[in-house]
Each structure stands twice: as C-alpha cells, then as structure tokens.
Amino acid sequence: VAALACALTGLTIRVSAHAVPPVAGKDFTKPAIVILGYGLKPDGSMRAILYHRTLTGLAIAQAFPQAPVIVTGGNPRNGQTEAAQMRNLLVMLGLPPSRIIVEDRANSTVQNAQFSVPLAKKAGATGIIVVTSSTHQGRADQNFADAGGNVLATVSFPDGNPSVNIAQFVRDVLSPLTPIG
C-alpha cells in the first residue's frame, strides 16, 4: 500500500543512513511505532514533512504487523490535529484503525515523548521505534530516552533543512514550562 501511495504521488520513502539497525539484545517482538507530528498548514492539511513521516511510519508498520502505531501531535489548525491527520492518511492507505493509537495533546517533541511512552507501555510494547525526520532525529531520541522510553530504533528520512530546527528547539525548551490544557 505504501509503495502504491508513493508511486501515485511521486514520493519516495528513504530510510536515513543514520537509522539504528537492530542490535542484539533488543526485543523487536512487539515494538510500538511512534510517528512524530509536524505543524499543519493553516487550512489544517499536512505539510510535506508530516506526509513523509506518515508514509515512512506506514512502511515500518507493514514490516511489524504486530506493532501498534502511535501518531502523536496536537497543535490544531482549522479543527484538525497533527495526529488526526496522520490517522486519516494511514487508514486511507489501508492500515487497520485498530492498530492506531491517537495522541493529540502534544505540542512539542518533549511532549510527544512524555505522552507516547506511557501509551506504548500500556499497549504492551517491548520498546519504541521512533519515526521522524533526519534533522530532528537526535533531539527526538534524547527526548524519548528522557521520558523513560526504550528506544529500539529511529527511522528517519533526509529532510535537509536544519534551519527549521531553531524554532522547534525553542518550543521544546519551553514546553515543559507550559501548562497542558
């Protein structure tokens, strides 16, 4: 399904050279696949980075059919959250809704981790496979480790725009100080 979606849209899914390969001693029997959100357009539609992350997550979900898929991201625009848009795309591309766990309160990478780690544990996951963008990978890995997550691997695609990280970094530094409503 992901290959068909890519063929129809002209997009390709690439796994970053920095993706962590399976390591002896890590338990991949039931990982939770956590797809990190990215800000929506003002009209509530997905930006290309979020679309790529979601397709990458779908490819990983197909490789691990026993794994729950956690889509995480709030930041509503025009009545839609990042998580809701990812869920809609995954279902449209054939992922069973029963595999998807929606986390739609997070407004930063720190909160993605804080809210997703307990959901993964509740789902009985043996660890987490984080799906994000290459310029976001290091920070995401650290945030999930800080939140007590057992990060088995991180899968990312090259997004090639480190300047985007400045605003994200500032938001992530401030997010633990921001009340969640």
Language model features: what each stretch is:
Residues 1-14:
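Secretory targeting and sorting signals
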Residues 13-171:
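A structural signal for short, hydrophobic/glycine-enriched beta-strand patches
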Residues 169-181:
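Glycine-rich flexible loop motifs, especially short His-Gly-Gly/GGXG/HXGH segments used as catalytic or interaction
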